[in-house]
């Protein structure tokens, strides 16, 4: 919550940023500050756990538990005040996801899920869509905007889905996209080059 408040306050100001190699791969000082704050809190409560964070790198304490942190998923949106960005944190036990939290900051919506414990939005249970026909669904996607090969691959898939469904959206924050699948407001999420499998398939996705 403290990191989310830091990001919320920063979103109201003019933001300086730099690119991490490619023109559309941005990082802000707020990314770094939020990452430091989250990492500090985890270390205070779980000093023996491994931590992998987008801006600060990783440690390796040989723990069965590993925390994955993206302090601002959707940094480009954050820079442009486009209201789709979130704090995303996951916990893995022996390589398997057991807890996930995604905080949709512009909409003040906190998603939470735990293995065997269900999925929630602001303490209300959520579930995936009940639709049984692919062509009745709305879908979301993401792709790395600075890799031409993967853009081309994604565009072909997007074209096929778009022609056979209610459409495809790309909002620029994959963690929120997958939460929207979990909430049932879209039917599936597609992306090439996901580094870690962090979502279960919906009724309609392969």
Question: Across the structure, where does each feature detected by a protein language model lie?
Answer:
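DPxDG-like acidic metal-binding loop motif
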Residues: 61-120
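Residue-level signal for inorganic ion chemistry
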Residues: 7, 31, 42, 75, ...
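An extended, acidic
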Residues: 127-199, 203
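Short, solvent-exposed loop/turn motifs
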Residues: 97, 125-127
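N-terminal subdomain of lithium-sensitive/metallo-dependent phosphomonoesterases centered on the IMPase/IPPase/PAP
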Residues: 1-72
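Generic detector of well-ordered alpha-helical packing
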Residues: 32, 36, 55, 71-74, ...
